[in-house]
Every structure is written in structure tokens, then in C-alpha cells.
Amino acid sequence: MSKDIIRVGIIGAGANTRLRHIPGLQAQPGVELTAVANRSPESSARVAKEHGITRAADHWRDIIVDEAIDAVCIGTWPYLHAPITIAALEAGKHVLCEARMAMNAAEGHAMLGAARARPNLVAQIVPAPHTLPFDQTIIDLVADGAIGDLVAIHALVTTGSDFPQWDSAPHWRYDRDLSGNNIMMMGIWYEALMRWVGPAATVHAVGQAVVKHRKDATGRRIAMPIPDLIDVLCRMEQGGQMRMSVSTVLGLAPDTEVSLYGTEGTIKLAESDGKLGLWSGRRGDSALQPVQIAPENVGGWRVEEEFINAVRGTEAVTHTDLVTAVKYMEWSDAVCQSLSTGESVHLPRLN
């Protein structure tokens, strides 16, 4: 697209959209935010006023049918990602969609199919951002043989974890009707791991909802179908195996850390005082040492810049393309299937 002004409609103005996507898009030269549709006309009007967006729409479909709008940014909960993405692509609009990609892999494949049917349009999923400063360095270390062949991945994800909060309020992330097969932070960490060592070939999972029910706004007790503690075992496609433990209900738990163990070395990405750091060591070393990351390898958040550049034809989408996003949705589906059946699941599940 070579036009000077790219007009973007915002559909769903949640916290990340207001914090990241709206200001990020407004910072791009030649971009105009022309409309916003949130969950109600009142909230749409409020967001439009707060962020200087031209018009508040009554419904997201009003943005889809507006021929003056070139692209949409979708910041809704996952249950609407597929219907809005597909409708926008069919209407000839470029799409930037918040993560997680969809409710499940079937929806993800439908989104990918709609995008492939319209190769002139850009479709991008917001990437897992937490490892961006480290990704290129880890990729280079693995590719250059720093760990040799992959033996094992040990991932402990406890960000935000505490003893069970029995009186905590329901959240959309606990609601399978809104969140689908996405569970806690497992998807964003698997997406990061795929950048480093590729996808899994098999999945076996066990888990539970320790907080089994919560009270909704009316005081009614409702079940929590999404686990707050899971352990996932995988065989990796390139060899080696993975053990990932994710929880929000472990009191006094160690900080989040992910280690790649190889035949010749080890890489560890670990959280301390809320910040991630990178360490590595090789055969013969007595301990892991901090990795000095070259300035040119320090990645960061540039989602909106990448999207607009892709729309203008000056950059290809890498963070994240729909093919990659479908792979993490297939893995999430496999985790849920294994949780349900107690059996191992082979990937890919759909072709």
C-alpha cells in the first residue's frame, strides 16, 4: 500500500491496546486512528475522547464495513479474534490482532486460511514480548553450538504466583468461553521457546484448578474450568525434551526461569526482582556466567511499527506471523486434549 495516510480502526480497547497499540500506532507517520469500537457505545466514546480518536462506533461491524478504514487493530478477548479477523480480511482490511491468536487451533487455521486467500493484505498477531531483548542472542548461541545438541528444557513459570486466593474475583482468563484453550502464561513462553529451538513433537500434560470456584458479580459461585497449575512434558522436534511447569497458586515459589541443557553447554534465562537476565556456561566451566548482549542484538517492542511498515510494503511480518501463531495454538490444544484424556498427543494436529 503506497497511500500517504493509513486509516486504522480500533476494535476492543483493553489495557494493552490503550497502553501499547493506540499510542504505538499514533506514533507512526501517516497513520490516523479514525474509529474505535469497544464493548459499549459509552466506553467507545470514552476511549475516543481520551485518545483523540476521530469517531466512536456503536459496534465492531461498523468498522468492518467502513470503506474508508484500511486496517484494524483487534484488542478484544480471544473469543472474538477469529470472527473479527476473518471479517476484516474479507472486507479488504489489514489486521493486527492481539495475542493469544484465537480460542483454539481450528479458529487459528481459519484465520490463516483467510489471510492466505488475500496475500495482498497484512495479518499479524501481537508477539510474546517478554523475551524480545534476549531472543536473538539465544538463537545465535544455540545456532553456533554453544549448547551442542539439545538435551532438555526446564521451564518454571511462576510470574505473579502466590498462595491460592480463595476470595479472588473471576477474570476472563479463567473463562473458557472467552479465553478458549489458552492457559495462564504457557502460550507466551512456548512461543518464545519456538523462536529458540523450534516446536514440540509430542505433548503430555497434567494439571488442576486449585481454586476450583469463585463468586461472580451477583454472588453466584461458578466453576473454574481453566487450570491454575499445570505440568507439561514434550519431546521436541529437533531432539531433546521439555518440562514446563506453570502456576499462579504456588506460595513462596522460586522466580521464573527457563534453562536449555545441551550436550556441551547450558543457557539460562531467569527472573530476579522482576527483571530477566541471561546466563550461559560450557563443558569445563564451574558455574554459569552472565551473558553480555551486543547492543545490536537487543530486541524490543516495535509491533505497531512493524505492522505499518508491512502495510506499506517495506517490511515482512516476523513478530508474529500467522503460521507461527497457529503452531502455538496447536500446542495449546494438545495440552488441553492431554489434560482431558490423560494421553500423549502428537503434533502437528492439523495440516
PLM features per residue range, with description:
Residues 184-185, 190-275, 304-310, 314-315, ...:
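Contiguous beta-strand/loop segments that form the cofactor/metal-binding neighborhood of enzyme cores
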Residues 1-5, 71-74, 109, 116, ...:
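C-terminal helix-rich "cap/oligomerization" subdomain common to oxidoreductases
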Residues 16, 39, 294-305, 320:
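Active-site loop of classical SDR/Rossmann-like NAD(P)-dependent oxidoreductases
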Residues 2, 71, 77-78, 82-130, ...:
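Beta-strand-loop-alpha-helix segment that lines the small-molecule cofactor/substrate pocket
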Residues 53-59:
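Conserved SAM-binding strand-loop segment of SAM-dependent methyltransferases
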Residues 121, 129-222, 342:
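Predominantly a Rossmann-like dinucleotide-binding segment in NAD(P)-dependent oxidoreductases
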